[in-house]
Amino acid sequence: MAKSLRSKWRRKMRAEKRKKVAPKELARLKSALGQGEKGEISMKDVAEIATVVPPEKVKQKPADVDMQEEEADGGKMDLDTKRNKKTMLDEHGRYPVWMNQRQAKKLKAKRVGKNGKPKPKKRLAW
């Protein structure tokens, strides 16, 4: 799909704005890290710029260790919902969240169409 003039213009303007704001943002980051004029770091300033994670969460097991344990358990995911593989519907009659709405509508029409009116039997034409 071709890029519209509007999207190109907006991208260009965002890039110019980034250039304009970059020195100020750099100064904020440096001051938050304590490399600026003051040597102290206030957590309020850091929280404005970045997400603050408590040290307990950082000290927990790394994610790769968790993956190794899951593989050792059998490698199967634990699913809360049961899904019909053919129709992709769960037990409540809903399609998965990742499915496109058009695709869900198409599958529903196909499913409902099968249970519609029966076709008349073919007869001999006299």
From Swiss-Prot:
Basic and acidic residues bias (residue ranges): 73-94
GO biological process, one term: dendrite extension
Region Disordered: start-end pairs: 1-22, 53-126
Main location: nucleus
Record field: compositional bias (Basic residues): 1-21, 103-126
UniProt GO MF annotations: basal RNA polymerase II transcription machinery binding
Any Pfam family the entry gives: LLPH
A single Gene Ontology CC term: nucleolus
Keywords of the record: Chromosome, Nucleus
Subcellular location: Nucleus, Nucleolus; Chromosome
InterPro entries in the cross-refs: LLPH-like
Task performed by this protein: Regulates dendritic and spine growth and synaptic transmission.
Family: Belongs to the learning-associated protein family.
Protein name: Protein LLP homolog
